[in-house]
Amino acid sequence: MRMIVGLSGASGIVYGIRLLAALRELDVESDLIMTDLAAKMVEIETDYRVSDVCALATRVHDCFDFTSPLASGGFRNTGMVVIPCSMKTIAGIACGFADNLLLRAADCTLKERRHLVLVPRETPLNTIHLQNMLALAGAGATILPAAPGFYHRPAEITDLVDHIVGKVLDIFDIEHHLYHQIGRAHV
């Protein structure tokens, strides 16, 4: 299994960091694309260094390297997650405006009919945001808002983050124990 992980410049960068860590723990290869603003969010929202985040990925790709294999629809992978996904990124993908590698990889993921999961954290949403997400859902993307559930009785922020990351892994049928799934015994 090989997954593309895009980190865009939305608040909630901890979701992307946790996904990279979970993929590493689960022996899933990850190809990371991080925008400049995402790197800034790492500094603003966490105690991580950007190099620490990059070290969680199997491979790191420059966001403006259009010679990367990720810029081709022929690049074999399981799918792509953009987590967190800014409204700018959603708009770019929805309009087919691929001016960086993250947007181009998302475009390739859609056109090749692979799983594309977008995790927006923005709130509130305006009509333009909703229309862009509706267009992407119609094109085959999964919109998974960073809106954690509470049925698993979270005790810490990490429980809330793990719930969303677990939902992403569920879409790709990746077994995990990040949250208690209703109907399954807690392991």
Where does each model-flagged region fall?
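A cross-family phosphate/adenosyl-ligand binding-site feature
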Residues: 1-117, 123-184
